[in-house]
């Protein structure tokens, strides 16, 4: 009723400019009834394109619905100290850290690597400052969150690999919203386990954490299977937040690029197969090879991009003629922008469930290639009409999930 009345009065103001005070009165009621304080907890600032863009996408989508949204500025040491050249983040280096000489040898080696990333780090810091709305308070431990939790109507965990049991964040109660006040609704959106199963040793912890959640959605089909193995029947699969925003929005959001006719490489592991596929299509089509790198360049690439931020990342994918990667979000945007692409598996088969689930969602499972592939049989013939329809169906379902969460608060 309020939505209907508000629409009527807004139309009256636009056409007749009357009923001013009634509109203001209804606005007050509307804000009280429908505007909520929402906090998001995710790995938002780890100098990763996908992590930054998915955090922004969920924040912006919820803001467009009229809500007050903040990302909890949670910076646990296991995530953020690895960008500190003086810090040891792996227990296997504990013994080295106890000796002065080896400690400084490690620091020098780490600094030598990190200095190549400083330009990229600056781009990410600017993106975070300009686009991510963080809580005023920064939290460094779960205990700090528990002692002084942010006040919100709803706290949303996700998206991305926040529940990956192979990483420390997958065993951190913070990412299961275990710190929230009793009256705060706890919801996950497109959270990812990033694996096909979790070990028996982790099941009790994960099940106990998820039992406190009000609503659960995950990003992968395998995530739903994991939930079922934990006796959690009400979990659903939704799309990554980057799909919540329209293609047109991303086109205006990205930095403008003018380069054309290139194969874009985004490779985490130095894949020899990716290199061979890139060189094959370079010979076949006459395209150049561009590579996005964390630090060290790909020597076979015609051009390496090391000082790029999330908006440049989008532009490079949007303007490429072909995309090759083992990145989930790189693949997601290639699909969304209707770019010819191939996906390469990461070492450790369980880590590939993210890409496999995405490709299954859009009926492009044949784009995941392995070592035994015949490169000469690879092609660039794509019919994205069906893909786009499938994306719209899943997007609508994902939005309905969020709508149901917000309406039942």
PLM regions with names:
Residues 2-10:
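Extreme N-terminal basic, low-complexity initiation segments
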Residues 10-11, 20:
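Short, intrinsically disordered, low-complexity terminal segments
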Residues 30-409:
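Active-site anion-handling motifs in enzyme catalytic cores
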Residues 5, 19-35:
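Short, Lys/Arg-enriched N-terminal segments with co-localized hydrophobic residues
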